[in-house]
């Protein structure tokens, strides 16, 4: 009989996986979190907690010793008592910075309250209000501790008791309590911290962790990591996540280890910062999910100029979780780390993929492995063995109890002292999550082989995109509304193809029409396009496959449901191949109805280039195909430009002409004009049509201060089949086109261009950065002409810009542009100016040129002369803004704000952006968006930005 897959880990077994030969010693065994902070202060008073905020530089690390932090939070806890809340009251902590969250949590604990960490609220008003109301009902009351920004986000919900952290800090200044003061002596089984689930399958549940569950987890984690009081730990995971607060804060605190907590945006915006911090702070333990490992590797493996630049010998372990870790990605990352190191032979660390959930205090199963010395056996890294005290087993998912043999897949269940005790005020959900014997049903499908676990799927209704869980039921609800889909005969199922780095999904559905009918191709094409559009707009990802299955062949369970697991199984076995083939046949037929075969040699050559970029058959390419409707991105534009120039032997095909001529036949005509040297200087037209499909009101987007509009390409594709998207590009890029000399000249030109493109209102105008004030003036001009402007979008720009324009000299403008283009890091853009200013322009350009990644220069087709000219264009726009003084008003403004170039986000909003209200006749809207000033529309942030932006358009009736 095969062995049964039940695994537990003892101290002896775990020792094999300790990443350091040092012994992890906890001086005493604390029973509560109160004991943890007291012990840390007594034993290591001068060890430090460091913080890098969302807007700080590497040199701006704010630190507090354990002793100073302890005194600070106890004073805050004393001030909290003035709220008059009874012991055990739940306080919802809604803050963004690590230090603020950490401070608030400890203050709540010491005051005898129970903190509940609230992740970022939805940008969708209805969803946000529904969630906050749910939290209020769940806890029976609603006490929130937040910032001014957070308070503004929840001010539309009545019945909340809101306290500002800034006011609490002021109140605490009058107290100096004893270093061991507490308002309440906690007990091990008291509720300690509540964590909210993602809410991916409905409203969030509140996971209850006691002092006992948290300490059981943290002790075992620290032993697994080999932590000591001399360790240095780096964390950038948000504090509202169990990995950030428990795994990377309380665990090292338990062992007396110093910590550095970095805002996630600081790492994502500048991946090199992670390496600099490992080098400068001798970091031993860090965390990086698969998508960050992949991003770091892509960004750094070609930076040959950085090879040998860092001392990375201190790093011993990098934990990874949130999504499966691709083995090849882990190996490439480890190899790149060695190349970047000053002493590659001294670099020896493990990448430890792991399994954990909010319900298990984050990671409880790990597989630390040196991926360069030990080649992974599977496509994804194994997840390993349980930490001390944790057990795991694989069972039949139907009954949740019958054990599966070693090597056979089934439902993963875990148990141990680190597993949560219950869901707050939700006995039904708690009961359904456990089976006899105290085993917790994780909802994941796994395999245990020789004591090592790996996942093979998921029972729960979620799909993970770059580490973020999205609820499948909610997605299906919207997909069911598409014309052509038979009601209740649609299922979306997670799927990861072999070799694919991130998870995707497949849509299975039964069409309302006959797949063999006369008009089947037209209806199928429209249905699939509508399904794709909903997916992109809801979860930022199109389906990998859409499989139409006739109703009479779509089997349901006895409960009348579609089985996602069964559909995926049929797909993998090839049993749906006939339906997929029929779908492809009909879609080809639909394309054929509008198919125009490329006829000229130029059209054929461009069609071949298009096919190569989009991985399509050359025979499928039509002369009427639009580059952006095929899915073209800003990076694809550069590739098309480069390949076109090489094929036709042209010195340059201007990027703007690709944007203006995205259709094969139109671009071919332009190329032919270049080849015949018959391309006369075109009359300047600021309008660049990036997306022309859809019937809703078009959106016009004014360029940022660099004048170019390539930044909008990735945003525009989200508006396909919804509304046209036009960008306005500055004058001066093309030969014979002079720069603008005043704001009035620019606004007059742009307003006239908008009117030529869309004769009558209502209008929707937006501008990014500098373009925001231009958009405001264009909106005023259109209203003065008697037209209605229903939307004026202002992206991270204040109304008063003249002072800032006067601050920017040629050097500052050149460095801003260079950072925007990805030629230099934010760190260099901020620090180089004093050294460059005494140099000549050519010398300054030469310095930046040498710092620029060679592949980026090739990608942008830049030369020193082109960069110099581009700086002059940006400079001309700065000159136009030096005398700008806003006046008048528009019907309403929608302001979108991100992390500013300098200063805090709160100051940026309240003191710089809020004055827009004085220029809005209606209610002004202020909406927080992810990212920093220069990154809010980049590849990583545009999926979220488009959802938020489109939400505001809808709110304005567009």
Swiss-Prot record:
Q: Where are the residues of the annotated region Thioesterase (TE) domain?
A: 698-946
Q: Where is the Carrier domain?
A: 597-675
- Residue numbers carrying O-(pantetheine 4'-phosphoryl)serine: 634
MF (Gene Ontology): transferase activity
GO biological process, alphabetically ordered:
biosynthetic process
Q: Which cysteines are joined by disulfide bonds?
A: none
Region entry Adenylation (A) domain: which residue ranges? 60-465
Looking up SUPFAM superfamilies in the UniProt record yields: Acetyl-CoA synthetase-like, ACP-like, alpha/beta-Hydrolases
Please convey what the UniProt record notes about how activity depends on pH.
Answer: Optimum pH is 7.5.
InterPro entries according to UniProt: AB_hydrolase_fold, ACP-like_sf, AMP-bd_C_sf, AMP-binding_CS, AMP-dep_synth/lig_dom, ANL_N_sf, ATP-dep_AMP-bd_enzyme, PKS_thioesterase
Q: What temperature dependence does the UniProt record describe?
A: Optimum temperature is 23 degrees Celsius.
Q: Which UniProt keywords apply?
A: Phosphopantetheine, Phosphoprotein, Transferase
Could you tell me which residues belong to the region Thiolation and peptide carrier (T) domain? 602-672
Q: One Pfam match, by short name? A: PP-binding
Instruction: Supply the EC number(s).
Output: 2.3.1.-
Pathway the protein acts in = Secondary metabolite biosynthesis
What this chain does, per the entry, is described as:
An L-tyrosine:2-oxoglutarate aminotransferase and atromentin synthetase greA catalyze consecutive steps to turn over L-tyrosine into atromentin, which represents the generic precursor molecule for the entire terphenylquinone and pulvinic acid family of pigments, which are widely distributed secondary metabolites in homobasidiomycetes. The first step catalyzed by the aminotransferase converts L-tyrosine in to 4-hydroxyphenylpyruvate (4-HPP).
What protein family is recorded? Belongs to the ATP-dependent AMP-binding enzyme family.
Protein name per the record: Atromentin synthetase greA
Q: Which gene encodes it?
A: greA
């Amino acid at each position: 009989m095969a062995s049964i897959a039940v695994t537990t880990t003892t101290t002896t077994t775990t020792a094999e996986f300790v990443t350091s030969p040092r012994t992890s010693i906890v001086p005493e065994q604390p029973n509560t979190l109160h004991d943890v902070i007291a012990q840390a202060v007594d034993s290591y008073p001068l060890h430090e907690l460091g913080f890098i905020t969302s807007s700080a530089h590497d040199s701006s690390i704010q630190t507090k010793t354990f002793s100073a932090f302890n005194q600070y939070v106890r004073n805050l806890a004393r001030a909290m008592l003035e709220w008059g809340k009874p012991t055990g009251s739940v306080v919802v902590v809604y803050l963004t910075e690590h230090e603020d969250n950490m401070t608030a949590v400890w203050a709540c604990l010491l005051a005898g309250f129970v903190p509940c960490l609230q992740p970022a609220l939805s940008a969708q008003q209805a969803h946000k209000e529904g969630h906050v109301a749910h939290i209020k009902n769940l806890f029976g009351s609603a006490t929130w501790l937040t910032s001014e920004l957070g308070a503004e986000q929840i001010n539309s919900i009545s019945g909340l008791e809101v306290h500002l952290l800034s006011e609490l800090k002021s109140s605490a200044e009058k107290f100096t309590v004893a270093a061991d003061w507490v308002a309440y002596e906690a007990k091990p089984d008291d509720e300690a911290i509540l964590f909210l689930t993602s809410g991916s399958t409905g409203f969030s549940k509140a996971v209850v962790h006691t002092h006992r569950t948290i300490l059981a987890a943290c002790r075992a984690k620290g032993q697994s990591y080999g932590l000591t009081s001399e360790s240095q730990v780096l964390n950038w995971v948000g504090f509202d996540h169990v990995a950030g607060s428990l795994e990377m804060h309380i665990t090292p605190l338990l062992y007396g280890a110093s910590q550095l907590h970095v805002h996630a945006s600081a790492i994502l915006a500048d991946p090199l910062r992670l390496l600099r911090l490992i080098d400068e702070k001798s970091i031993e333990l860090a965390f990086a999910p698969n998508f960050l490992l992949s991003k770091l590797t892509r960004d750094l493996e070609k930076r040959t100029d950085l090879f040998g630049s860092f001392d990375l010998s201190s790093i011993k372990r990098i934990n990874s979780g949130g999504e499966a870790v691709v083995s090849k990605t882990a190996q490439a990352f480890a190899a790149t780390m060695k190349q970047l190191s000053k002493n590659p032979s001294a670099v020896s660390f493990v990448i430890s993929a792991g399994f954990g959930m909010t319900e298990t205090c984050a990671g409880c199963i790990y597989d630390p492995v040196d991926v360069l010395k030990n080649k992974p056996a599977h496509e994804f890294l194994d997840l390993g063995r349980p930490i001390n005290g944790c057990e795991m087993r694989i069972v039949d998912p139907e009954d949740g109890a019958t054990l599966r043999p070693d090597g056979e897949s089934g439902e993963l269940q875990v148990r141990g002292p680190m597993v949560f005790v219950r869901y707050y005020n939700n006995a039904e959900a708690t009961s359904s999550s456990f089976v006899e014997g105290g085993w917790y049903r994780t909802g994941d499908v796994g395999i245990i082989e020789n004591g090592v676990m790996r996942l093979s799927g998921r029972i729960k209704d979620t799909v993970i995109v770059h580490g973020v869980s999205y609820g499948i039921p909610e997605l299906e609800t919207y997909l069911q509304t598409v014309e052509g889909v038979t009601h209740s005969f649609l299922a979306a199922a997670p799927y990861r193809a072999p070799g694919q780095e991130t998870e995707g999904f497949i849509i299975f559905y039964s069409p309302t029409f006959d797949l063999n009918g006369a008009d089947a191709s037209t209806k199928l094409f429209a249905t699939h396009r509508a399904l794709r559009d909903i997916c992109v707009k809801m979860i930022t990802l199109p389906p990998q496959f859409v499989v139409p299955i006739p109703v009479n062949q779509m089997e349901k369970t006895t409960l009348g449901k579609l089985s996602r697991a069964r559909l995926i199984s049929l797909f993998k076995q090839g049993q749906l191949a006939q339906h997929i083939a029929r779908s492809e046949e009909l879609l080809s037929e639909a394309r054929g109805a509008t198919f125009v075969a490329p006829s000229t040699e130029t059209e054929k050559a461009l069609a071949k280039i298009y096919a190569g970029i989009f991985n399509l058959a050359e025979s499928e390419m039509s002369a009427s195909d639009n580059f952006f409707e095929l899915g073209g991105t800003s990076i694809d534009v550069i590739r098309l430009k480069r390949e076109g120039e090489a094929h036709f032997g042209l010195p340059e095909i201007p990027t703007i002409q690709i944007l203006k001529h995205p259709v094969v036949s139109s671009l071919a005509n332009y190329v032919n004009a270049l080849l015949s040297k018959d391309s006369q200087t075109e009359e300047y037209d600021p309008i660049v049509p990036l997306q022309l499909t859809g019937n809703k009101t078009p959106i016009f987007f004014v360029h940022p201060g660099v004048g170019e509009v390539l930044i909008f390409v990735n945003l525009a594709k989200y508006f396909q089949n919804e509304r046209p998207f036009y960008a306005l590009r500055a004058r001066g890029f093309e030969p014979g086109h002079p720069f603008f000399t005043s704001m009035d000249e620019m606004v007059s030109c742009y307003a006239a261009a908008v009117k030529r493109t869309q004769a009558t209102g209502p209008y929707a105008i937006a501008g990014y950065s500098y373009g925001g004030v231009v958009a405001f003036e264009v909106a005023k001009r259109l209203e003065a002409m008697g037209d209605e402007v229903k939307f004026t979008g202002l992206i991270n720009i204040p109304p008063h810009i003249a002072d800032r324009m006067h601050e920017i000299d040629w050097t500052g403008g050149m460095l801003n542009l260079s950072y925007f283009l990805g030629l230099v890091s934010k760190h260099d853009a901020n620090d180089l100016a004093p050294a460059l200013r005494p140099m000549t322009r050519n010398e300054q350009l030469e310095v930046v040129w040498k710092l620029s990644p060679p592949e980026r220069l090739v990608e942008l087709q830049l030369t020193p002369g082109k960069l110099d000219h581009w700086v002059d264009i940006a400079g001309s726009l700065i000159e136009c803004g030096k005398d700008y003084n806003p006046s008048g008003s528009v019907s309403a403004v929608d302001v979108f704000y991100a992390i500013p170039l300098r200063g805090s986000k709160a100051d940026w909003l309240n003191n710089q952006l809020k004055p827009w209200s004085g220029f809005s006749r209606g209610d002004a809207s202020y909406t927080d968006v992810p990212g920093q000033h220069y990154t809010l529309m980049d590849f990583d942030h545009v999926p979220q930005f488009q959802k938020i932006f489109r939400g505001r358009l809808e709110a304005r009736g567009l």
